[in-house]
């Protein structure tokens, strides 16, 4: 059956958003590179990326967010991690120029155990992946561990739990077993993980959320 006949939903189900795999996983990631662009651009407006920053993207998927951030980082370094080999391969292809100039690395790794020393990154972002994190509270503590003092973490999603979600959105949450907290629950998760100066950004007219957390100077 050709992709002209198959629906995007069929490709997404086959491609497995939780752990992209196979040819359909690659197709799904390339589509997500485009569909996630608006929410990513909105969320990045809450950051001031410096040219010397060291930046980590957790659950980097097809690599589009990294490619966008790389335009602002000239002498710093960017790293993407994903536990899906298909995602790693797709993100590497998306960012081949930056990788070839040693400005970026894409690694196969999980948020459960990030392969980095404490206090490594100035900024950390995750776009549309928190839904699938296996142990959200524990995983947020792992993010805080590798974030530098005074560093910033952005959690970006195009849906959060609230009244009035569409039937289709609720169906997707059920079918893909998405972890989908309310803004208040996000704040509690971040507080209990040890983040400070937590800000919840919501987009008017959309279901988008960006949770911004900081690592206080002197934190461990």
Where are the regions a protein language model picked out?
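C-terminal alpha-helical "lid/dimerization" subdomain adjacent to the S-adenosyl-L-methionine
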Residues: 6-12, 18-33, 154-212
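Conserved alpha-helix/loop element of class I SAM-dependent methyltransferases that forms part
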Residues: 34-53, 68
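Short glycine-dipeptide loop
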Residues: 52, 147-153
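Class I SAM-dependent methyltransferase SAM/SAH-binding core
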Residues: 54-113
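A short acidic, Gly/Pro-enriched loop at the edge of an enzyme's catalytic core
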Residues: 112-123
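A short SAM/SAH-binding and catalytic strip from SAM-dependent methyltransferases
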Residues: 123-135
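A short glycine-rich, Lys/Arg-flanked "PGG" loop and its adjoining helix->strand segment in the class I
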Residues: 137-149
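C-terminal lobe and adjacent flexible extensions of AdoMet/dcAdoMet transferase-like proteins
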Residues: 211-220
């Amino acid at each position: 059956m050709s992709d002209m006949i198959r629906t995007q939903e069929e490709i997404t189900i086959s491609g497995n958003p939780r752990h992209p795999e196979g040819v359909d996983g690659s197709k799904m990631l390339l589509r997500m590179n485009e569909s996630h662009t608006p929410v990513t651009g909105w969320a990045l407006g809450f950051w001031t990326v410096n040219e010397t920053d060291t930046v980590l993207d957790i659950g980097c998927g097809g690599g589009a967010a990294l490619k966008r951030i790389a335009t602002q980082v000239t002498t710093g370094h960017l790293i993407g991690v994903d536990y899906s080999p298909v995602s790693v391969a797709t993100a590497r292809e998306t960012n081949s120029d930056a990788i070839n100039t040693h400005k970026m690395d894409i690694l196969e790794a999980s948020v459960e155990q990030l392969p980095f020393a404490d206090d490594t990154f100035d900024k950390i972002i995750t776009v549309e992946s928190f839904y699938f994190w296996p142990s959200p509270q524990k995983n947020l503590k792992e993010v805080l561990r590798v974030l530098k003092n005074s560093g910033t973490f952005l959690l970006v999603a195009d849906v959060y739990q609230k009244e009035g979600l569409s039937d289709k959105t609720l169906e997707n949450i059920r079918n893909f077993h998405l972890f989908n907290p309310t803004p208040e629950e996000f704040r509690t998760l971040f507080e209990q993980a040890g983040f400070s100066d937590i800000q919840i950004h919501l987009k008017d007219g959309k279901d988008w959320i960006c949770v911004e957390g900081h690592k206080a100077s002197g934190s461990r």
